[in-house]
């Protein structure tokens, strides 16, 4: 296990990241990959959104500035479901360069884009083991995962 000392954690997602300990999980209603919050559980730590959102740049798909209703699109008959052109993610946007002692929480897609562009990802983390409330809404996670 690797431990970073004197680490500052910045959350570069658009929402807070709330961390719970394993004891916060309702073992009667949870299974691996589908963790449910126990009644009365309180978070261990919350990382507020930093204000900067690291993301992956989209390549392909529909041109910028085209309103969804004006796009040329395929349809999935007979349901009349619009189908847009595919996109891929290439490169990152608003992802700072690595800084000693600073860990960055990013989305899975931003982390994968950083890895694909050859960035050193030792400082990048995503959420792991999502925790949901009784209604199924995501309320936090049990850990962070390194971007490999």
Residue ranges and their predicted role:
Residues 5-148:
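Intrinsically disordered, low-complexity segments enriched in small/polar residues
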Residues 1-3:
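N-terminal amphipathic/basic-hydrophobic helices that include classical n-h-c signal peptides
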């Amino acid at each position: 296990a690797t431990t970073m000392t004197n680490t500052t954690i910045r959350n570069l997602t658009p929402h807070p990241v709330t961390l719970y300990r394993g004891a916060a999980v309702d073992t009667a209603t949870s299974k691996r990959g589908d963790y449910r919050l126990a009644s009365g559980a309180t978070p261990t730590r919350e990382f507020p959104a930093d204000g900067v959102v690291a993301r992956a740049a989209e390549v392909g798909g529909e041109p910028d500035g085209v309103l969804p209703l004006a796009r040329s699109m395929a349809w999935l008959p007979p349901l009349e479901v619009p189908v847009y052109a595919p996109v891929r993610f290439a490169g990152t946007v608003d992802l700072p360069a690595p800084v000693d002692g600073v860990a960055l929480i990013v989305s899975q897609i931003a982390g994968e884009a950083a890895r694909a562009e050859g960035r050193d990802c030792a400082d990048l983390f995503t959420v792991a083991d999502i925790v949901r409330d009784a209604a199924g809404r995501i309320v936090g996670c049990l850990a962070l995962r390194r971007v490999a």
